[in-house]
Amino acid sequence: DYTSFAIGIDLGVNYFHEENDFSASLTLKNLGGQVKTFDEEHEKLPLNMQVGFTKRLAHAPIRISVTLDDLTHWESSYYNPEGKDISFGDLLFNHVVMGVEVAPSDRFYLAAGYNCKRANDLKADGGSKWTGATLGGGLQLKRIKLGVAYANYHTAASSLVLNFSMGL
């Protein structure tokens, strides 16, 4: 009988400056560890620290977001499996997720994002030109909300998600 047991928690803190429409957040994912080991060897949970910033432009209905992901594994072999020399810029962009949202009204928005690490990983495996990109939008009519999102998380397929919600 092979079993293992671990306890983990995600923690986050957010600062929001309403006057400047600026937000800064810090999250720590997978804090914790094994309680019962699989084979007497303790394994660490994959700790992930993220820092994100979002700012709405002062004179346009545009919000820009930048998140730095997996900061606890800055130069991990996961980001450089062949052990080659990587420039600071390339290393930095392996941790960057960018997004932009255009919301001309409270009832309509369009959004786009780009995950540099996902793009690099999947393009190396033959991914499409959309690899790493996400697109979405939403519309709110009186009591009905409609949303659509596109993402490419695999070399063989993309996902298209439609959502519909209605207030009671």
Task: Put a short name on every predicted segment.
Residues 1-168:
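Outer-membrane beta-barrel porins/channels
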